[in-house]
């Protein structure tokens, strides 16, 4: 039994790490997963990032085997191949994208058809089982799978809002270093400020909320806010630290003006 699945990256509009309520926007960096159900009880993972072999998704695949066993009584093991355009642990929602793609591929392999919300619930469960998320990151998972601007309450497992994203380029500034979620301090003391940004975003002022989120996250995590100021001065419509960093994202209509600021040009999707 074999199956395929795909999902995409996303950027942060409002970070949900403080209270589980976040907003994210899909971008067109893709993750593809191939899953084969094995007779033998073992897990095999091959993974490639930007065409180069790199270990990602092992904990997710191990947890996927357990999830399929408990939910669908699928015995045996899993062989998975993961092909990602998203550098891991850079704040660009690679974990959510890999989790989504693996769930879709596994369901395809066993012949199960479920709706998008059920895919998201399984993906969040998978991420929690693998221990790679604090909140469940439903906002990231939904933006990754569905595209558009997605606001969600991960603790209540509710999508609060989804709207189509404008057709605008996104310039990404992606440092070489990784920042695992486990290294990020507790942000719960700032939950009221993030609540205000969440309300601003779902009221329609999501670009303004994104910018203010960037300044707040830079202050809390000791990033240089001048990186955001530079993007705005070069014509960006909005910019922010994405997730817990270290990547920054700038939404713009003239990406060529930011090519010296960033590394990768993507698109909202």
List the model feature ranges, each with a label.
Residues 92-116, 145-147:
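DPxDG-like acidic metal-binding loop motif
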């Amino acid at each position: 039994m074999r199956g395929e699945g795909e999902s995409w990256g996303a950027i942060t509009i409002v970070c949900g790490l403080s209270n589980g309520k976040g907003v994210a926007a899909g971008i067109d960096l893709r993750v593809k997963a191939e899953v084969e159900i094995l007779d033998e009880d073992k897990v095999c993972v091959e993974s490639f990032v930007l065409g180069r072999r790199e270990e990602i998704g092992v904990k997710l695949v191990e947890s996927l085997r357990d999830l399929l066993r408990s939910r669908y009584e699928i015995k045996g093991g899993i062989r998975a191949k993961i092909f990602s355009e998203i550098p891991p642990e850079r704040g660009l929602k690679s974990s959510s994208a890999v989790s989504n793609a693996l769930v879709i591929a596994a369901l395809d392999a066993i012949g199960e058809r479920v709706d998008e919300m059920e895919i998201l619930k399984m993906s969040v469960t998978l991420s929690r089982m693998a221990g790679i998320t604090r909140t469940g990151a439903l906002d990231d998972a939904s933006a990754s799978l569905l595209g558009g601007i997605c606001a969600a309450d991960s603790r209540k497992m509710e999508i609060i809002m989804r709207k189509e994203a404008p057709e605008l380029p996104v310039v990404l500034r992606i440092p070489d270093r990784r920042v695992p979620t486990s290294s990020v301090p507790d942000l719960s003391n700032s939950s009221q400020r993030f609540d205000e940004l969440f309300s601003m975003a779902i009221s329609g002022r999501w670009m303004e909320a994104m910018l203010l989120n960037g300044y707040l996250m830079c202050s809390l995590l000791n990033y240089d806010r001048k990186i955001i100021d530079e993007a705005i001065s070069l014509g960006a419509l909005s910019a922010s630290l994405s997730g817990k960093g270290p990547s920054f994202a700038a939404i713009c209509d003239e990406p060529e003006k930011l090519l010296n600021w960033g590394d990768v040009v993507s698109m909202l999707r």
